[in-house]
């Protein structure tokens, strides 16, 4: 069940398996997302730094630079705060922890249902937008939603 959206949201989809990338991209576009694609880690880092996205869906196993390194470099070197969902077949606890340690906001294990990906995207985007509406100066917190 898709949530109605008032405006399009942009997503960078980083997946080296073309068939899966096309399936996920088509689904997201049908639910009012604007999707950019990257099939490798270097392209993902370039797009993640030069463009502004509402979220990034990032596969861990990529040619060249892996997804964990991409995530860590976007967070540490480029200070990118865009929500990142790791997308991978790795389902061991250690793998998940490495994803979160690299800076991921969520972790989705393949195979997955498209509505679950959409729900997770909606959630990380909603949380990131909520955080942008809160400001703190000298211990005084201001929430623009309550004004």
PLM regions and their residue ranges:
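Short, Lys/Arg-enriched segments at the junction into DNA-binding effector domains
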Residues: 9-10, 122-147
């Amino acid at each position: 069940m898709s949530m109605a959206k008032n405006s399009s949201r942009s997503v960078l989809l980083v997946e080296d398996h073309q068939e899966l990338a096309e399936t996920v991209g088509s689904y997201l576009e049908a639910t009012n997302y604007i999707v950019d694609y990257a099939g490798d880690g270097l392209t993902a880092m370039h797009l993640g730094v030069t463009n502004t996205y509402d979220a990034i869906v990032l596969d861990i196993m990529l040619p060249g630079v892996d997804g964990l390194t991409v995530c860590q470099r976007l967070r540490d070197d480029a200070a990118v705060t865009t929500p990142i969902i790791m997308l991978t077949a790795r389902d061991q606890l250690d793998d998940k922890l490495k994803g979160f340690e690299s800076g991921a906001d969520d972790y989705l294990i393949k195979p997955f249902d498209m509505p679950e990906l959409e729900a997770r995207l909606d959630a990380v985007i909603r949380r990131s937008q909520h955080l942008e509406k809160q400001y703190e100066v000298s211990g005084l917190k201001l929430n623009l939603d309550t004004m």
